């Protein structure tokens, strides 16, 4: 009996273990089975995320596109109106209500036409693809091909243009810009009174940016009477033409007059090109018919009188004079005469170039006129050099209107006071100018000028002279961009003479506009101020990437996080500095670092600070800025992998 109970107990234990094992296996199978739903949930979430990226939202009737959903959205649409905008752009905000009205109108079109907007600051791929360089930029997409819209930003005009493009039989108008090759170049250029030619490379970013503006200008100028043609040359294919005209960069633009080339120095957008070429199409020199005109120039003029005296339009010297005038027409007013009466008054024979200063700028220390013999064999470049050399009086009047064209040469000695050549104040103005003349005659290597203290109030303030208490102040601006102020004292010729001599001997300390030097400057991006520019940027032992910015600049604000990331990326390199400078609050103490817009970025290589490399053409993102640094960094700052 006991034995039977024992066996029953053993059997019961065995069954219990079997049941436990089976239960564990079922649990394991359940767990295994349950893994698939979890994975499926993950896949579903990923699919949902992908769908979210591709989802197109609508805001007030306008579709919102980005880099991810753009292609899917436009794939099945014949016509789409696109606006590229920036969230901070004032013009974009102003245009938004009008754009929503356009969307509403085109939605009711038969068939409906989609209207979309793209934040170009975040959709960088699309902005690059469509060459967006300003905001807002409007384009019409026709069967996947972008059509530039350059009309007014009004509902009426935009809707009309979109409906025109949406027609089934619409095709893009033929290109107005002429395409030149070695086969047709000379024939076209030699027969044109004036023509603008662009030498470009298909891969060049600046050329791509210029292309739509250039074509718009070509269309506008083709409507003139007579029309002014614009042409282009692919310099990578037409290498002989590129070599013939010394094309070394892209795009290179040249003006041709009956085959003679002249540099194009104008703007690179539609209206700038149009205005510049219209001005260039006129005669470079104006004919003077009477002696009275010459006398009025001398009595009441405000600038150098440039007068060519010739026998007639067939005079070979006259043709050379015209060529020279064309090269300088933006900076000077040229005149010519065929009058023997005027020649007699000037006491010169025919075939002469005469330069004279108005009476108010004449002095006993300089000749009344400069005369050059001009014949058919005289080079236009020689005439040009002569004009530039003798265009300024010994002490001229520096004004905001002539500063860039007349007084860019350094060193420049400037005397500031109340300059007024009107009848009532001319005597006082000339009194101080005569004091300056007495010094200027002894320093022919320097340029001297007087300037009205009100016109240059900001400059006077930056020099620390606005509170000097003196009626007359003086300063010297040197070749490197440094400024030197004369200590406030009673002004006379002796004081000015002493000041200029001290500058010549290198005994003066420059005045530098500068924010306070940062106490803690160990961040990834070094802060440069006027007083530290030389110490940081011009350090000969270090490569420096310097960004010049303005606090109010939208593009600068957009760049800031990217630039900080760049600083962090290269922070470990001891011989490379990533830096920035508020160019509105600090002096740039070296004129090789020219800033004409914001942001401006330069790479200052170690050992060659006088030849900084400007960042141009690429996107201002981490990838392109890093590539720029790596391309130009010296061995000192290259990474170990590169070495």
From Swiss-Prot:
Predominant cellular place of this UniProt entry's protein: endoplasmic reticulum
UniProt motif Prevents secretion from ER: location: 640-643
Post-translational modification note: O-glycosylated.
GO BP, sorted A to Z: blood coagulation, fibrin clot formation; chaperone-mediated protein folding; platelet aggregation; positive regulation of protein folding; protein folding; response to endoplasmic reticulum stress
Residue window of motif CXXC: 89-92, 553-556
Record domain Thioredoxin: where: 21-167, 167-299, 503-634
The keyword Calcium is assigned to this record: yes
Single GO MF annotation: integrin binding
Sequence ranges of Acidic residues compositional bias: 32-56
Keyword tags: Acetylation, Calcium, Disulfide bond, Endoplasmic reticulum, Glycoprotein, Isomerase, Redox-active center, Repeat, Signal
Induction section of the entry: Upon glucose starvation, as well as treatment with tunicamycin.
PROSITE patterns, sorted: ER_TARGET, THIOREDOXIN_1, THIOREDOXIN_2
InterPro entries with a match to the protein in the record: PDI_thioredoxin-like_dom, PDIA4_PDI_b, Prot_disulphide_isomerase, Protein_diS-isomerase_A4, Thioredoxin-like_sf, Thioredoxin_CS, Thioredoxin_domain
Region annotated Disordered, chain positions: 24-58
Modified residues (N6-acetyllysine): 364
Cellular component annotations (GO), alphabetically ordered: cell surface; endoplasmic reticulum; endoplasmic reticulum chaperone complex; endoplasmic reticulum lumen; extracellular space; melanosome; smooth endoplasmic reticulum
Annotated Gene3D superfamilies: Glutaredoxin
Disulphide bridges, residue numbers: 89-92, 204-207, 553-556
Residues of the signal peptide: 1-20
UniProt superkingdom: Eukaryota
Catalytic activity, reaction form: Catalyzes the rearrangement of -S-S- bonds in proteins
Assembly with partners or alone: Part of a large chaperone multiprotein complex comprising DNAJB11, HSP90B1, HSPA5, HYOU, PDIA2, PDIA4, PDIA6, PPIB, SDF2L1, UGGT1 and very small amounts of ERP29, but not, or at very low levels, CALR nor CANX. Component of a complex containing at least CRELD2, MANF, MATN3 and PDIA4.
Family: Belongs to the protein disulfide isomerase family.
Name of the protein in question: Protein disulfide-isomerase A4
Lineage per the UniProt record: Eukaryota, Metazoa, Chordata, Craniata, Vertebrata
Gene name per UniProt: Pdia4
């Amino acid at each position: 009996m006991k034995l039977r109970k024992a066996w029953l107990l053993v059997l019961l234990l065995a069954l219990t273990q079997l049941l436990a094992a089976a239960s564990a296996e079922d649990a394991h199978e359940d767990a295994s089975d349950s893994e698939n739903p979890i994975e499926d949930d993950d896949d579903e979430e990923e699919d949902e995320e992908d769908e979210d990226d591709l989802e197109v939202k609508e805001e007030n009737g306008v579709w919102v596109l980005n880099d991810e959903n753009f292609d899917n959205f436009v794939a099945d649409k014949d016509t789409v109106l696109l606006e590229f905008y920036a969230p901070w752009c004032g013009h974009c905000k102003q245009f938004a209500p009008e754009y929503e009205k356009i969307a509403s109108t085109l939605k009711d079109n038969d068939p409906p036409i989609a209207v979309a907007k793209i934040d170009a600051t975040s959709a960088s791929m699309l902005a690059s693809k469509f060459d967006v360089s300003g905001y807002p930029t409007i384009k019409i997409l026709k069967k996947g091909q972008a059509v530039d819209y350059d009309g007014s930003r009004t509902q009426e005009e935009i809707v009309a243009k979109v409906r025109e493009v949406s027609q089934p039989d619409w095709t893009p108008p033929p290109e107005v810009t002429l395409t030149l090759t070695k086969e047709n170049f000379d024939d076209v250029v030699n027969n044109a009174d004036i023509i603008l030619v662009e030498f470009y490379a298909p891969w060049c970013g600046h050329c791509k940016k210029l292309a739509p503006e250039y074509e718009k200008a070509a269309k506008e100028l083709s409507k003139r009477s007579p029309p002014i043609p614009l042409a282009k040359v692919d310099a990578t294919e037409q290498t002989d033409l590129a070599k013939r005209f010394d094309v070394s960069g892209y795009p290179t633009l040249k003006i041709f007059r009956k085959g003679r080339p002249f540099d194009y120095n104008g703007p690179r957008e539609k209206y700038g090109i149009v205005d510049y070429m219209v001005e260039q199409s006129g005669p470079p020199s104006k004919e003077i018919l009477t002696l009275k005109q010459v006398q009025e120039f001398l009595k009441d003029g405000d600038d150098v009188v440039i007068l060519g005296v010739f026998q007639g339009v067939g005079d070979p010297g006259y043709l050379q004079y015209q060529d020279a005038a064309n090269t300088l027409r933006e900076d000077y007013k040229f005149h010519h005469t065929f009058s023997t009466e005027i020649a007699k008054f000037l006491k010169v024979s025919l075939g002469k170039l005469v330069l004279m200063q108005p009476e108010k700028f004449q002095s006993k220390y300089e000749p009344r006129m400069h005369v050059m013999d001009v014949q058919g064999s005289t080079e236009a470049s020689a005439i040009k050099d002569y004009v530039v050399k003798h265009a300024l009086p010994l002490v001229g009047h520096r004004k905001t209107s002539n500063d860039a064209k007349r007084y860019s040469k350094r060193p420049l000695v400037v005397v500031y006071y109340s300059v007024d050549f009107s009848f009532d104040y001319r005597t006082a103005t000339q009194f101080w100018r005569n004091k300056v003349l007495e010094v200027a005659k002894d320093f022919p290597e320097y340029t001297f000028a007087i300037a009205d203290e009100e016109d240059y109030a900001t400059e006077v303030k930056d020099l620390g002279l606005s509170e000097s208490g003196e009626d007359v102040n003086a300063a010297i601006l040197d070749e490197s961009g440094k400024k030197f102020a004369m200590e406030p004292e009673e002004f006379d010729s002796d004081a000015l003479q002493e000041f200029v001599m001290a500058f010549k001997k290198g005994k003066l300390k420059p005045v530098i506009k500068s924010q306070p030097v940062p106490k803690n400057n160990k961040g990834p991006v070094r802060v440069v101020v006027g007083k530290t520019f030389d110490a940081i940027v011009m350090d000969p032992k270090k490569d420096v990437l310097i960004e010049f910015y303005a606090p109010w600049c939208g593009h600068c604000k957009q760049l800031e996080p990217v630039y900080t990331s760049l600083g962090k990326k290269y922070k470990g390199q001891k011989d490379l500095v990533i830096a920035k400078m508020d160019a509105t609050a600090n002096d740039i103490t070296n004129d090789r670092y020219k800033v004409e817009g914001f942001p401006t970025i330069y790479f200052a290589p170690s050992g060659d600070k006088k030849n900084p490399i400007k960042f141009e053409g690429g996107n201002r993102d981490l990838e392109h800025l890093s590539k720029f640094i790596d391309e130009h960094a010296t061995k000192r700052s290259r990474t170990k992998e590169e070495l």
